[in-house]
Regions:
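Blade/loop signatures of beta-propeller domains
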Residues: 31-85, 244-255, 497-499, 505-510, ...
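Extracytoplasmic electron-transfer domains, predominantly the class I c-type cytochrome c fold
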Residues: 287, 547, 590-596, 609, ...
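Sequence/structural segment immediately N-terminal to covalent heme-attachment motifs in c-type
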Residues: 648-670, 685-695
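Short, conserved, GDST-rich strand-edge loop motifs in beta-rich repeat architectures
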Residues: 208-222, 263, 290-310, 414-415, ...
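C-terminal substrate/ligand-recognition segments
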Residues: 100-112, 123, 425-450, 463-567, ...
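Electrostatic cytochrome c docking/interface patches
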Residues: 42-45, 634-659
Length: 739
């Protein structure tokens, strides 16, 4: 029987108890696990007994419940200052954002990197055993909203499963890395679908979703697919939103959903609701869980009636794993027009309510509420803000619906809305400690200044990734006057700051009591600018680990939040760490590298380690008694070369700025970033600019053709704008050289 810990609920007079199978501070003595039939042999029995094998990290979240908690306690508060370098492995390939948490089974580490590369390493030494290149269609590299990231693999009965960026699902032989089967999961390659999330094992099938709700002119139509674990044979598919009006509904659940969409809506808008991450599975209920993304587009007026719910977007959904039929859903954000996905990681637990055990599922949602739902029925048990919000005054317990405020309505004028479109919590994993019974959440305490581009008087009317809107971060670089030409009139920073006594843009780690529904401790991790700080792991050593963009791996006392150690890696950390043991020695490992949503928001933030050091993608492992972590090579930008002569008119340059922001800025920033700074093109690339952009002559490097979105004149204008920006930078550089 699971251990039970009781406490009084802070709201609604509910007497609650937290009961988790993993809540023992150390696993009880158990017989040694039987020898595995082969490499990477994880099955249901072994996964359910994960606490008796604390040396392994079987899933992305370690266990069936997705807690990101380890019973290992060799490294503890008393000796963590001795934690140091054990080994590092260079991932190679494109140096982009790293968001995966490595899995470790019987001394072998399995992880994924950019685009869906897979690596198998000796977990004690970092020696490469094999590496898998998924190759595929690089034209699809245009499709992900937020870099060519990948959030991990699944390991099951001798196979390693990964989804590559172009939407193919790969099953690899864990011993050799050779593909056993590969299937294409994308239903329409003409639309901007991509896959970046980790697959989910659910009974006899492997389940995968996709992304694209934000992309292109009309987004995509979300769905999840299931395939036979052994053969890759297609088993079922669940669409999360109905098709265009007049088209066939694939299942009865869509008939109910269709009533929440305008039957006259423009079919170019596909509806969104993709499931791009955050799956979970309950083997007892045989239910697979996932969250869905925002509606497409954000401006619901473009869909006709802007007051409809738009099912099943921004929802937590449970499907029967055997059939793919709907068991239940809970919509966290009906009528979503703030990009409030519900795709964040889900944690399974058990709450005792009124003397009865309630199996629950928990999520710190992008919309700022911490949800506890009965995972058998979807009944709402609690919804409590875990950070500052102003878009809603609360959740009506009678209806389960949030109560929006006047501040949330940006249709009439630009508004600062908390949380921002990036969410109060996004993909970065949170962790539930079995020792303290607290959930450790990487929190983004930031608003968006939402702008209706189509009606606010600026030159920009469309922005790839935002449709006809934009959500601007009022960070330390925010200047309303400077932004007005593109975006129209915006609120000034002092007016925005009047709402808060803290920096408008900041990130924190918060210890959250899911029973009492309150903050126990917190630390600010970034301030003034987005830091893109990392996911969280906790251990039975009374430790909480979180990496930061500044390159430090921070270690806290799990009970009090006291800072115990900071280990400098010289690399930006976004992923959650893992911990494991080999031959009795405990290791902590983390995958490092900057990218993700940050590349769409401008240059690398000044606090990031990527400003000082090259963005070398690595897995870094630590152990007691290790030394300092070797940092990547120092970043030494070449000086600006003299740009080509400018022959374009002011009007052409201004038109080029609009097109650059509209179609190019999602990947390219003018400054340090993981993609090229296009002010620094050499003579050869300047001469080939049109062929690169329109005809994709650098497609093999990930820069595919854009002749379907840009005309020859558009490209000439963009080039003129970049040359203008290059001259500005070059003149400033030359002026700085003068005595």
């Amino acid at each position: 029987m699971p251990t039970t810990i009781c406490a009084a609920a802070a709201r609604a007079g509910l007497a609650c108890c937290l009961s988790l199978a993993t809540l023992a501070t150390a696993a009880p003595a158990a017989p040694a696990a039987p020898a595995a039939p082969g490499p990477a042999w994880v099955d249901q029995a072994r996964l359910e007994g994960a606490n008796s094998e604390p040396q392994n990290w079987f899933t992305a979240g370690r266990d069936q419940d997705g807690t990101y908690y380890s019973p290992l306690a060799h490294i503890d508060a008393g000796n963590v200052k001795r934690l140091g370098f054990a080994w590092a492995y260079d991932l190679g390939g494109p140096q982009r954002g790293q968001e995966a948490t490595p899995i470790v089974v019987d001394g072998v580490m399995y992880s994924s990197g950019t685009w869906g590369y897979v690596y198998a390493l000796d977990a004690a030494s970092g020696k490469e055993l094999w590496r898998y290149d998924p190759r595929g269609d690089w034209f699809a590299a245009r499709n992900p909203c937020c870099d060519l990231v990948n959030r991990g693999v699944a390991v099951w009965k001798g196979k390693v499963y990964v989804a590559s960026g172009d939407g193919r699902l790969h099953a690899l032989d864990a011993a050799t890395g050779k593909p056993v089967w590969v299937v294409d999961t994308i239903v329409d390659h003409k639309l901007p679908y991509s896959s970046t999330g980790a697959p989910q094992i659910a009974g006899d099938v492997v389940v995968i979703g996709n992304g694209g709700s934000d992309m292109g002119k009309g987004g995509v139509r979300g769905y999840v697919s299931a395939y036979d674990l052994s053969s890759g044979v297609f088993r079922w598919r669940f669409y999360t939103v109905p098709p265009a009006p007049g088209q066939r509904l694939e299942n009865p659940e869509l008939a109910a959903a269709a009533k929440t969409w305008d039957p006259r809506r423009d079919p170019q808008y596909k509806g969104g609701g993709t499931a791009w991450d955050g799956f979970a599975y309950d083997p007892a209920l045989r239910l697979v869980y996932f969250g869905t993304a925002n509606a497409a587009p954000y401006d619901l007026r473009l869909l006709g009636n802007p007051n409809l719910d738009g099912l099943y977007t921004a929802s937590i959904i449970a499907l029967h794993a055997d059939s793919g039929r709907l068991a239940w859903y809970y919509q966290t954000t009906p009528n979503d027009h703030w990009d409030f996905d519900s795709v964040q990681k889900l944690i399974l637990a058990t709450l005792k309510i009124g003397g009865a055990d309630r199996r629950v599922i928990m999520q710190a949602c992008k919309n700022g509420f911490f949800y506890v739902l009965d995972r058998a029925s979807g009944e709402l048990l609690s919804a409590t803000p875990f950070t500052y919000i102003n878009w809603a005054s609360g959740v009506d317990r009678a209806t389960g619906r949030p109560v929006p405020t006047a501040q949330s309505d940006w249709f009439t004028s630009p508004k600062d809305v908390y949380p921002s479109w990036s969410g109060a919590h996004t993909w970065n994993p949170m962790s539930l400690s079995a020792q303290t019974h607290l959930v450790y959440i990487p929190v983004i305490d930031t608003p968006s200044v939402w702008v209706d581009l189509a009606h606010n008087g600026g030159a920009l009317k469309f922005l790839d990734g935002f449709f006809s809107t934009n959500g601007i971060f009022p960070d330390d670089s925010y200047d309303a006057a400077d932004l007005e030409r593109l975006y129209g009139p915006l609120p000034a920073l002092p007016a925005l700051q009047a709402e808060r006594k803290v920096k408008l843009v900041r990130e924190l780690i918060r210890a959250w009591d899911p029973v009492a529904r309150r903050i126990v401790w917190e630390h600010e991790t970034s301030s003034g600018m987005r830091g893109y700080d990392g996911g969280v792991m906790s251990t039975a050593g009374n430790l909480v680990f979180q990496g930061r963009g500044s390159g430090g791996l921070w270690v806290y006392a799990a009970d009090t939040g006291k800072v115990l150690d900071v280990i400098n890696t010289g690399s930006h950390i976004m992923a959650a760490p893992t911990t494991y043991a080999v031959r009795g020695e405990q290791y902590v490992a983390v995958q490092v590298g900057y990218g993700g949503t940050g590349i769409a928001e401008g240059p690398v933030p000044p606090s990031s380690a990527t400003v000082k050091f090259e963005n070398t993608n690595r897995i870094i492992a630590l152990k007691l008694g290790g030394g300092a972590v070797p940092t990547p090579p120092a970043r030494r930008p070449e000086p600006f070369a003299r740009p080509p002569e400018q022959s374009a008119s002011k009007a052409a340059i201004e038109a080029g700025e609009v097109k650059f922001v509209e179609e190019c800025s999602r990947c390219h920033a003018l400054g340090i970033n993981v993609t090229p700074d296009l002010r620094r093109l050499d003579a050869g690339l300047n001469a080939q600019f049109n062929d690169i952009v329109l005809h994709g002559i650098l497609g093999a490097a990930g820069m595919e053709r854009f002749d379907d979105l840009l005309s020859e004149q558009d490209v000439e204008h963009i080039h003129a704008y970049l040359i203008d920006q290059a001259w500005i930078a070059y003149r400033a550089q030359q002026a700085a050289k003068r005595p």
